[in-house]
């Protein structure tokens, strides 16, 4: 399915934590419903204004009944800083959904004991993933790591099994790495999104225990459709694949 480009309307725009925002918008195109792991590109400035590129942001939550989509994002540069100016009633350009997300139907057909692992803003797409898994009859165990203070955790309580948190500072939860919270051998599959070093470590631990692992990669993107090759990642076989088109979700054994 090709991505759609629409003018979306802001319903809410909340400050969640330091430099973390939650943007809720009305997505009017029913034929282009997003799924877990997919992303949209957002633009709240003119075509002749900097930055040149729209900003790719993963889907935090999609509600088909209300046609609303939520984006949990970190304010890290000029583009996301401009997004923070959006307020209720404003319109902005929204293009998507894009990419190959988590194959939830395929996952549910093969696995019952599922671990969802996230780090930092990499936790953003894991809420929609957890919702879709729970809707399919499996409540996954959720393990998230943060630098200092966790955010958006309460919403997992009703749709997940175990919910555990680690922090780098020890301010909340376990003092250490998120990969220390679980044993891959206890699960049929592990689904991961977060900093590259964390995903690489999670993939290694899963490989050692023989547990399948799927990761959602993050790369700077330009076109969002695989044409410019700006977000290419190299597979273990030496092949180049576009994160925006072939991913962002990959079998960890393919990319790590």
Regions inferred by a protein language model and the residue ranges of each:
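Ferredoxin-reductase
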Residues: 1-88
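Structural signal for conserved beta-strand scaffold positions within catalytic alpha/beta enzyme cores
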Residues: 12, 61, 165-167, 215, ...
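Short microdomains enriched in Cys/His and/or Lys/Arg
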Residues: 246-256
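Local cysteine-cluster metal-coordination motifs and their immediate loop/turn environment
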Residues: 125, 219-248
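FNR/FR-type flavoprotein reductase catalytic core
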Residues: 78-220
């Amino acid at each position: 399915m090709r991505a759609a480009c629409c003018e979306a309307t802001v319903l809410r725009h909340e400050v969640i934590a330091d430099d973390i925002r939650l943007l809720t918008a009305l997505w009017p195109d029913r034929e282009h419903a997003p799924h877990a792991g997919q992303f949209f590109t957002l633009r709240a400035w003119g075509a002749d204004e900097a930055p040149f590129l729209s900003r790719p942001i993963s889907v935090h939550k999609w509600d088909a009944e209300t046609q609303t989509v939520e984006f949990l994002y970190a304010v890290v540069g000029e583009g996301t800083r401009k997004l923070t100016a959006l307020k209720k009633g404003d319109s902005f350009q929204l293009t998507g959904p894009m990419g190959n997300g988590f194959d939830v139907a395929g996952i549910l057909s093969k696995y019952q004991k599922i671990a969802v692992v996230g780090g930092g803003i990499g936790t953003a797409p894991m809420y929609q993933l957890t919702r879709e898994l729970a809707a399919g009859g499996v409540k996954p165990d959720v393990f998230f790591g943060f630098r200092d203070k966790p955010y958006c955790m309460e919403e997992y309580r009703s749709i997940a099994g175990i919910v555990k948190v680690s922090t780098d500072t020890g301010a909340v939860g376990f003092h250490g790495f998120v990969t220390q919270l679980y044993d891959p051998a206890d699960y049929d599959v592990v689904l991961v999104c977060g900093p590259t070093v964390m995903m690489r470590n999670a993939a290694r631990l899963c490989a050692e225990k023989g547990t399948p692992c799927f990761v959602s990669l993050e790369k700077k993107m330009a076109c969002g459709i695989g044409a410019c090759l700006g977000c290419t990642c190299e597979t273990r076989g030496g092949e180049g694949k576009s994160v925006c088109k072939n991913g962002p979700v990959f079998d960890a054994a393919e990319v790590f």
